[in-house]
């Protein structure tokens, strides 16, 4: 009996050793896979700056949390904004021109911008934070729909006027006001014909994804 008990104890110890060994190997493999995945993700995130004819890349905006966009800065004050799934926008400084040979899928935004058509309501607070509400002339929300006091005040004073909601903009008013940029929310994707119409009129459309 003692011999049998000893044999059972030896078998149990061996099984325990095998189990621990198996788990150690499994954990090691998981760690290796995790490191490889993280490395691959880092490589994917390290995007190569776009080569723009006539411009020299300088640096990129450092982002701590945002993942939906990136900003690359070039010489002479040019900046390329990339918004995931929405496209790229080249911001051209006042007095400068868009470089020749620019890719057709890059939208040009010419500074200064003083007559923005803001449809994405969530972006208004960002404009307030940078003291930029004065650059918004056209609103996609009526005065009583704004929760931001500065926007209400601007509409009450006439500095900002209602130009129709995202799916029914007042094209004539927007054109008369010399709109240089329309900032839309993702709701515009339900009415792609509106975005196409604005672009046909030469108005850049940027879809905000915050």
Language-model features, listed with the residues they occupy:
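Generic detector of N-terminal low-structure segments
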Residues: 21-24, 30
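Charged, glycine-enriched surface loops/patches
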Residues: 191-210
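A short, structured surface patch at a secondary-structure boundary
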Residues: 77-83, 87-175, 181-188
């Amino acid at each position: 009996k003692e011999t049998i008990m000893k044999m059972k104890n030896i078998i149990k110890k061996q099984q325990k050793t095998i189990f621990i060994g198996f788990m150690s190997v499994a954990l090691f493999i998981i760690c290796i896979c995790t490191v490889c995945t993280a490395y691959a993700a880092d490589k994917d995130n390290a995007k190569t700056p776009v080569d723009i004819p006539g411009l020299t890349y300088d640096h990129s905006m450092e982002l701590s949390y945002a993942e939906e966009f990136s900003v690359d800065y070039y010489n002479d004050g040019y900046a390329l904004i990339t918004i995931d799934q929405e496209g790229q926008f080249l911001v051209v400084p006042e007095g400068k021109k868009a470089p020749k040979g620019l890719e057709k899928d890059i939208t040009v935004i010419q500074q200064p911008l003083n007559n923005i058509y803001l449809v994405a309501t969530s972006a208004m607070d960002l404009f307030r934070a940078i003291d930029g509400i004065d650059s918004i002339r056209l609103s996609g929300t009526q005065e009583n729909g704004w929760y931001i006091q500065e926007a209400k005040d601007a509409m009450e004073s006439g500095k900002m006027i209602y130009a129709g909601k995202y799916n029914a903009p007042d094209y004539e008013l927007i054109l008369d006001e010399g709109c240089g940029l329309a900032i839309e929310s993702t709701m515009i994707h339900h009415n792609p014909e509106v975005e196409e119409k604005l672009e046909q009129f030469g108005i850049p459309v940027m879809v905000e994804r915050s």
